[in-house]
Regions:
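Conserved acidic carboxylate
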Residues: 10
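The feature encodes the CheY-like receiver
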Residues: 16, 58, 76, 88
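Short hydrophobic/Thr-rich beta-strand motif most characteristic of the beta2 strand and flanking loop
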Residues: 27-34, 42
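Active-site beta3 strand of CheY-like receiver
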Residues: 47-52, 57
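C-terminal output helix
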Residues: 108-117
Length: 151
């Protein structure tokens, strides 16, 4: 079984501790950091499988940290889920442009967070998809209305 180590970078002590407890109860192994600099130090000692990162941090912004990580020869392959109180297409685009792999708006449902994290770690392993003929597609039937990030 692959590691479920996750680096949670969140400056709010209450939210950081709460996320740590919830993620632990869901089978994840959280590493907690309150700042960008602390996150960089912890990455060197305990490389995670995925990063959940607030975009507003006290020292290095989440945008700056994502840019640093995506340029790093070792850490650039670690998926980053951006968490921000800003919502909408502009916020999403800004996070993705900085190098984040996905985006979630605060507040969020734990089930949505868990689904996003699972998708990110699953996406690490490339899968070959072979299409042998025309597919019937029902985009309305595939939509999960409980996911606010779903179009």
């Amino acid at each position: 079984m692959l590691s479920k180590k996750i680096l949670v970078v969140e400056d709010s002590c209450h939210l950081r501790e709460l996320l740590g407890k919830i993620l632990t109860s869901r089978g994840w192994d959280p590493i907690l950091a309150e700042s960008g600099r602390e996150a960089l130090a912890k990455l060197e000692c305990q490389p995670p499988r995925v990063i959940l990162m607030d975009m507003r941090l006290p020292d290095i912004s989440g945008f700056g940290l994502a840019t640093i990580l995506k340029k790093h020869p070792v850490h650039r392959s670690i998926p980053i889920l951006a968490a921000t109180a800003s919502a909408g297409d502009l916020a999403r685009q800004r996070c993705l442009s900085a190098g984040c792999d996905d985006f979630i708006s605060k507040p969020f449902a734990i089930s949505v967070l868990e689904r996003r994290l699972t998708n990110l770690v699953s996406a690490e392993t490339p899968k070959t998809i072979v299409v042998t003929g025309p597919r019937k597609c029902d985009p309305i039937g595939e939509k999960d209305s409980s996911d606010p990030g779903c179009w």
